[in-house]
Swiss-Prot record:
Protein family membership: Belongs to the MetA family.
HAMAP family recorded: MetA_acyltransf
Top-level division of the source organism's lineage: Bacteria
GO molecular function, a single term: homoserine O-acetyltransferase activity
Keywords annotated in UniProt: Acyltransferase, Amino-acid biosynthesis, Cytoplasm, Methionine biosynthesis, Transferase
Entry-linked CDD domains: GATase1_HTS
GO biological-process terms attached to the record: methionine biosynthetic process
Job of this protein: Transfers an acetyl group from acetyl-CoA to L-homoserine, forming acetyl-L-homoserine.
GO terms for cellular component: cytoplasm
Pathway: Amino-acid biosynthesis; L-methionine biosynthesis via de novo pathway; O-acetyl-L-homoserine from L-homoserine: step 1/1
The name this protein goes by in its record: Homoserine O-acetyltransferase
Gene this protein is translated from: metAA
Length: 305
């Protein structure tokens, strides 16, 4: 199916991936974008969401308390803040990573708001997905799995050595490989068995699932483009010449994408899990036109690119 954007930097370009069918069921996803390059992150997640077997409408948000340092005017014009959405409900929520995993949580300017987001999602979101730092922060705040800060960065593309259970998130996936770029780990030995999906004894958990709060936690970056790890490496080595190259990533000195198939299939499985949760609580999932008619907006007209 297709993705249509309610707001965001891509919205300025009337950006739509695929063919949007207004009579097909549509789910609403809140994407809390904590990454500094928000346009790139929008593109990365939008591409993955386009593989879901259902139409997706995305609302991009930033924390109200966060001091934005890049493209401030464009972000404030094209994003909503979390204060704008506390009264709303969403079918799904994705919270991205953030380059703050070397800071103490309490020093992050939106930490209190992030903790409120965790509590809010229990009553306002059907299914949640936390990536990299967001997973780290959620584990620390809610104490449902251990997190540990590292002095050296884990950087590269790694395959899970352990699949702990054949969860629906891993349907048609014999293994999991994804980019990792983090200064933290979730030690396998400290994680409750009910939460484990995929991981490694050395690198820690890759994927965790907590059915009690309808949440999935990914410690890496399925969404990364082929060049993202390379760009991070070039940024870091300009600051510290001793920065180690990302592992299992450069072949013949060129970045190689070996995770895309895993990423696309994982997001399809997550979308199907979300749809299953939604249909168990309601008889049907509304179409885009049904939602617009209920609001008195009439049928939708979309521009396809």
């Amino acid at each position: 199916m297709s993705v249509i954007l309610n707001n965001g930097l891509l919205k300025r370009e009337s950006f739509v991936i695929g063919r949007f069918e207004v009579l097909e069921p549509t789910i609403n996803i809140l994407l809390v974008n904590l990454m500094p390059n928000r346009l790139q992150t929008e593109k990365q997640f939008t591409r993955l969401l386009s593989h879901l077997p259902i139409n997706v409408r995305v609302t991009f948000a930033v924390p109200s308390e966060h001091k934005i340092r890049h493209d401030t005017d464009a972000i404030m014009t094209n994003y909503v803040t979390l204060n704008d959405i506390w009264h709303k409900k969403f079918d799904g929520m994705i919270v991205t990573g953030a380059p703050v995993d070397r800071m103490k949580f309490e020093q992050i300017d939106y930490w209190d708001e992030f903790r409120h987001l965790l509590e809010w999602r229990k009553t306002h979101v059907t299914e949640s997905l936390f990536a990299c730092w967001a997973a780290y922060g959620a584990g620390y705040a809610e104490r449902n799995f251990p997190v540990k800060a590292l002095s050296e960065k884990i950087s590269g593309v790694f395959q899970a050595s352990q699949i702990f259970k054949r969860h629906s998130l891993l349907k048609d996936l014999e293994n999991i490989s994804m980019p990792q770029s983090r200064y933290f780990t979730v030690p396998n030995f400290g994680v409750a068995r009910r939460l484990k999906v995929a991981g490694d004894d050395i690198l820690g958990a890759f994927i965790l699932r907590d059915e009690h709060v309808n949440s999935t936690y990914i410690t890496g970056h399925f969404e990364y483009d082929t060049e993202t790890l390379e760009n991070e490496y070039l940024r870091d080595i300009a600051i510290d010449p001793n920065t180690i190259k990302p592992k299992n990533y450069f072949y013949n000195n060129k970045p190689t994408n070996t995770w895309q198939t895993y990423a696309e299939k994982f997001f399809v499985n997550w979308g199907e899990l979300l749809m299953e949760k939604m249909t168990s609580s309601r008889s049907t999932i509304p179409t885009l036109n049904q939602e617009r008619n209920k609001l008195g907006l009439g049928t939708s007209q979309c521009k396809y690119l």
